[in-house]
Regions:
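Interaction-mediating elements
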Residues: 2, 25-330, 339, 446
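Bacterial N-terminal signal peptides that target proteins for export
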Residues: 2-11
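C-terminal motif of bacterial Sec signal peptides marking the signal peptidase cleavage site
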Residues: 20-23
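Strand-connecting loop/turn motifs
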Residues: 129, 214, 232, 364, ...
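C-terminal outer-membrane beta-barrel translocator/porin domains of Gram-negative envelope proteins
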Residues: 277, 374-378, 491-671, 675, ...
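Gram-negative/organellar outer-membrane beta-barrel architecture
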Residues: 297-298, 317-546, 631-632, 638, ...
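One-face residue pattern on beta-strands with alternating periodicity enriched for small/polar residues
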Residues: 384-390, 426-430, 457, 477, ...
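C-terminal beta-signal and adjacent terminal beta-strands/loops
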Residues: 684-700, 723, 731-753
Length: 772
């Protein structure tokens, strides 16, 4: 192992030294008189400045232009640009490397000292340093053909806000409205003056006014004046209106007059659109507080009841306007949505707005095709294909009916351990209704920007494990999905029924399948809650939480008083499963800079079978290993506990457990542009049984479960094409829980030069999407 590591380290060092040597010679490609701009250094000389490091960082980041990017000290993109040379044609490899991979040199002539002095002055004043002294110089080295900039800054004292005044003396109703929310100001006494805070406070005021009828107001009509007349480091801030620049409409509060929904809008160029949208042969159908305009009744008027958030007579509200648009979008029935607001006055001079929502229906019917292929390390390949048909408005209320036919196979083309080929075919139907069916039974919050939905699902799947068993499953579900807010989602399925029928073949004795066989009915509710802070916008730290509660047979068990010592109770002639299952998936994402990310996940899950069941149905149990689990172990062949197939003469098809604990950490960093990322990861965890199984010794969960933790690590690539993420991971075991005490950690046995070691330990995972 040491020899292979030394060779690998030596080759890596040699390649890096060669790249650095080449990078240092980039200036030889410059024309006579040209220099390469290497960047600028900013030094804040005020020793008393508490924010010295912060100032140097933000000021250095403000200087323009930016020098050529460096990766571990090497201007890699500039080197590739120079290596490629001048393209001889508009196509070809040379052109691609130069334009797509490479980066043109940033020349010294593009660096303007005086312009950057002004940039730094503005940046300092925007952060409360109103009277700085900036000394700059430029260093041109004609011999090395390089240019550098140097800025020495005496920031001076920083000014803090003493008093904040909101339009005192202004007697207009608009000014009074602004003063009403002065207590919610983002500008606080004693805080340093920050232009960003002033701009944010203007936006806060604008948002409030737009939600109280002031349709024509703009934050640009507000100006913050600063008085630095005192000899102290305190200033007074006066928020004022630019009254002389504001049109009369700005001071008026508008109310809603009428609301119209046009479901036949044609989105074209301006000229064509006007002609296409003339309201010929259209009916205007009044319904409650709005009217629907359409040629024929493609959509029932009641559809828009939960979407339209304002009523005639209400003060105009930007928030409710956006909420209406978002709810119309979430109906998933329209490909184009546009709102128009027209101002008018009533006979008394009251300012009014007429709202028109123009909707272009999406094609009502659509076909979809999906295909996928995969390869696994245990010499297995597979493929899946599905064909779907969707109707987006099956009952004229934006109800969506989707029917999907799918099929696939998985087979072995080699390898020491032979497993049977698998075949699957299935039919699924899904009806989605944009409202809560029987909604009066549930008290849920549906005031978010997303229309709550009800789902009715019906499906059948047939699985054939060649020479071992065949499996038939029928499922029916009735449930609800709604969003409490943009980052909180609930899924409640009070009715979930799955019927499972498994038949084994006579020659199935080659494999032990009792641990994956279940015959009977799974009946009970499920509830899932998801929180995702990433949806709300970019933050340095984001959180994700997904919790699931899955119950089966509990009400039936209470009614029938089930007892494990007796034969299982039946319903419709079939035994039913009785269990409680809970699982949580918690993730933390920490960003460094603009693109680097540290992703972490903790998964905890447990299922307990009781009453009418001795063990959990296999389709509800947990497994470990694979592309989204412990990536250094093969999928479904890790655990339970310290058990391993090498310790048993039994031939297992897969290994499952009742408890799962797993922790993952992964650091992602761009390798090229934004679409190619590299990753280094470590995974740890395992699965366990709650009840002893003599065929899997060591598989039961005990107080010493830590001894059974498996650990793997590796490297990966992520090809992020926005709409698709292709992931390649190479993992290997670092700790094998089935090994003898003192030998479980296998890091010191790593031997990349050994073919047999690589075949046994390197696991290649090809997958779609990030693992977490």
């Amino acid at each position: 192992m040491k020899k292979s590591i030394h060779i690998l380290t030596g080759l890596t060092t040699l390649c890096w030294l060669m790249l650095m040597a080449t990078s240092c010679s980039n200036t030889k490609y410059l024309a006579k008189g040209q220099t390469l701009y290497l960047g600028s250094k900013v030094k804040v000389t005020d020793t008393a400045s508490k924010d010295k490091g912060y100032l140097e960082e933000i000021l250095g980041d403000a200087i323009r232009p930016k020098p050529n990017k460096r990766i571990f000290g090497i201007r890699f993109k500039l080197t590739m640009y120079n290596w490629a040379g001048e393209p001889r044609s508009e196509k070809g490899l040379r052109k691609y490397i130069r334009d797509k991979i490479g980066e043109a040199p940033v020349l010294g002539e593009s660096f303007n000292l005086k312009r950057n002095e002004q940039i730094l002055l503005n940046k300092l004043q925007n952060n409360g340093y109103f009277y700085p002294v900036i000394i700059s110089r430029r260093e041109d080295d004609t011999l090395k053909k390089t240019t550098k900039g140097f800025f020495e800054i005496q920031a001076g004292k920083r000014y803090f806000m003493r008093n904040i005044d909101y339009l005192s003396g202004d007697t207009t109703a608009l000014a009074a409205e602004i003063r009403n929310v002065a207590d919610k100001s983002l500008l606080k006494k004693g805080n340093p003056y920050l232009l960003d805070a002033v701009m944010a406070d203007r936006d806060r005021i604008d948002d409030y006014l737009k939600n109280t009828g002031y349709y024509y107001f703009s934050p640009d009509y507000l100006i913050a004046k600063v008085d630095t007349g005192t000899n102290t480091d305190s200033i007074d801030v006066y928020m004022q209106l630019k009254s002389d620049l504001m049109p009369p409409k700005t001071f008026q509060q508008y109310r809603i007059k009428d609301i119209y929904v046009n479901t036949n809008y044609v989105a074209r160029s301006n000229t064509d659109s006007t002609a296409a949208n003339r309201r010929r042969n259209m009916d205007t159908i009044p319904y409650e507080h709005y009217s629907v305009i359409q040629r024929r009744e493609n959509f029932r008027p009641v559809l828009f009841k939960t979407a339209i958030q304002q009523k005639p007579g209400d003060l105009y509200s930007k928030r409710k306007q956006n909420l209406t648009l978002n709810r119309l979008v979430s109906l998933n029935a329209f490909k184009f949505i546009k709102s128009e607001l027209t101002d008018t006055y009533d006979s008394t001079g009251l300012p009014l707005l007429t709202a028109l929502y123009n909707l272009t229906p999406a094609p009502s019917k659509a076909l979809s095709f999906e295909t996928a292929a995969f390869s696994q390390n245990d010499s297995r390949v597979g493929s899946r294909l599905s064909v779907g048909w969707k109707h987006r408005n099956i009952f004229k209320g934006a109800e969506q009916l989707e029917i999907k036919l799918s099929g696939g196979f998985e087979m072995q083309y080699g390898g020491a351990q032979k497993r049977p080929n698998l075949y699957q075919i299935g039919l699924e139907t899904n009806l989605s209704v944009p409202r809560l069916l029987f909604g009066s039974l549930f008290n849920v919050s549906t005031t978010s920007a997303f229309v709550p939905r009800s789902y009715v699902k019906l499906g059948y799947n047939y699985y054939l494990s060649e020479t071992t068993y065949r499996l038939n499953t029928f499922n029916f579900g009735l449930g609800y999905q709604w969003k409490e807010s943009i980052n909180k989602e609930h899924k409640l399925y009070p009715v979930n029924v799955t019927f499972v029928r498994t038949d084994t073949f006579n020659n199935a004795s080659d494999f032990y399948i009792n641990n994956i066989i279940f015959n009977g009915i799974i009946i009970g509710p499920t509830y899932q809650f998801t929180y995702n802070s990433q949806i709300a916008g970019r933050k340095d730290v984001n959180f994700f939480f997904d919790g699931l509660l899955d119950l089966s047979g509990n009400i039936l068990g209470l009614a029938q008083k089930t007892d494990l010592s007796k034969e299982p109770e039946k319903i419709f002639g079939n035994p039913y499963a009785q269990y409680v299952k809970m699982q949580t998936d918690f993730r933390v994402y920490k960003t460094f800079g603009k693109e680097n990310m540290w992703a972490n996940r903790l998964f905890l899950g447990a299922g307990y079978a009781y009453g009418n069941s001795y063990k959990m149905p296999n389709i509800k149990q947990f497994f470990a290993g694979g592309a989204s689990s412990l990536r250094g172990f093969r999928s479904r062949f890790l655990g339970p506990g310290s058990f391993h197939t090498s310790k048993s003469t039994t031939n297992f098809l897969e290994l499952l457990g009742d408890i799962k604990m797993e922790a993952n950490t992964e650091f992602r960093t761009p390798l090229y542009s934004t679409w190619l990322k590299g990753a280094v990861f470590v995974d740890a965890g395992n699965i366990w049984l709650l009840r002893d199984d003599p065929t899997m010794p060591g598989g039961v969960f005990t107080k010493n479960f830590v001894r059974d933790i498996a650990v793997s690590g590796g490297l990966g690539l992520r090809f992020d094409f926005s709409i698709l993420v292709l992931r390649l991971d190479f993992g290997m075991p670092l700790r094998k829980p089935w090994m003898d005490p003192g030998e479980k950690w296998v890091i010191n046995r790593i031997d990349f030069g050994s073919k047999s070691w690589r075949q046994e330990n390197i696991v290649f995972n090809l997958a779609i999407g990030y693992p977490f």
